[in-house]
């Protein structure tokens, strides 16, 4: 449900609804129904805006991604970046059954997508973004090792500015003022204070990522390989992440040219530690 206060005249005109009135937003749409339609839509938007155009998706069956990567390899068209959202990602609006049981967890879902593009030799032409509880340094590090060019941070950044997971996002009645258009409730969020806390969180995340990568013997988190990350199993066993996600040697790693640039960049970065919090 899109609250009426968010349905501006511009949005109303685009969606064909009445301005200022709550608008139901069904999961279905008519923009496209297959891979060819998706690619056509992406290309039309890119042509009209001159900007990179990407797609975001939670992951279930693999057929769509196999088909998409094959069409992109054949035609040289398609999205410029792909955002893969793990099923464990946070939301305040999804039905409980969807939040708990729909879509694969990030590591399994992203691996399916990356493998499809890697088999078509497209991973240097498409940027990959990970999402889904990646605001923790160990999770972000694994995502980068799996082939992500960057990671999205949502839940943990919201915690930093006061989110208490009241699950009221879709009602416009967030009690802490984080996710609301209500002027009264917005007073619960002090930008002067919360902006500093969010900045400190981001600086700390970066600092911890760098510490983990240096513990692995490399200069930058993107240089950590899947063989350097193991997952603990029952009965005191562990398994390399590469084996879990089914990657071949070299998959997920940056190119030799990018590796050199990262090393040079980090050599020039003094990497100061984040300031201590109050």
How would you describe each model-predicted region?
Residues 1-14, 18, 40-44, 48, ...:
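Fe-S-dependent hydro-lyases/dehydratases of central metabolism
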Residues 1-2, 21-26, 270-278:
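Proteins with a high burden of low-complexity, intrinsically disordered sequence enriched in S/T/G/P/A and R
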Residues 3, 9, 52, 79, ...:
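Proline-rich intrinsically disordered, low-complexity coils
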Residues 4-33, 92-107, 190-194:
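Glycine-rich tight-turn/loop motif centered on a GG-T
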Residues 16-23, 46, 60, 91, ...:
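A generic structural signal for ordered alpha-helices
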Residues 29-186:
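Glycine-rich phosphate/ribose-binding loops and adjacent secondary-structure elements
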Residues 101, 112-125, 135-278:
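Alpha/beta catalytic cores of nucleotide-metabolism and tRNA/nucleoside-modifying enzymes
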């Amino acid at each position: 449900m899109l609250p009426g206060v968010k349905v501006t005249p511009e949005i109303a005109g685009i969606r064909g609804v009445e301005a200022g009135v709550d608008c139901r937003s069904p999961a279905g749409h008519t923009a496209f129904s297959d891979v060819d339609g998706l690619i056509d839509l992406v290309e039309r938007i890119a042509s009209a805006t001159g900007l990179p155009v990407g797609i975001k998706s939670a992951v279930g069956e693999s057929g769509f991604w196999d088909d998409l990567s094959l069409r992109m390899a054949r035609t040289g068209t398609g999205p410029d970046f792909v955002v893969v959202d793990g099923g464990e990602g946070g939301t305040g609006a999804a039905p409980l059954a969807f939040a708990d049981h729909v879509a694969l967890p990030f590591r399994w879902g992203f691996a399916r997508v990356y493998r499809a593009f890697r088999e078509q030799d497209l991973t240097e032409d498409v940027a990959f973004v990970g999402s889904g509880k990646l605001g923790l340094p160990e999770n972000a590090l694994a995502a980068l090792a799996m082939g992500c060019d960057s990671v999205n941070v949502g839940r943990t950044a919201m915690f930093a500015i006061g989110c208490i997971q009241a699950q009221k996002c879709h009602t416009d009645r967030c009690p802490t003022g984080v996710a609301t258009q209500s002027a009264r409730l917005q007073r619960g969020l002090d930008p002067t204070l919360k902006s500093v806390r969010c900045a400190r969180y981001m600086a700390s995340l970066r600092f911890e990522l760098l510490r983990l990568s240096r513990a692995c013997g490399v200069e930058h988190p993107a240089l950590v390989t899947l063989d350097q990350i193991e997952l603990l199993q029952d009965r005191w066993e562990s398994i390399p992440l590469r084996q879990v996600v089914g990657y071949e040697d070299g998959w997920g790693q940056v190119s030799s040219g990018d590796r050199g640039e990262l090393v040079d960049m980090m050599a020039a970065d003094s990497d100061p530690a984040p300031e201590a919090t109050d």
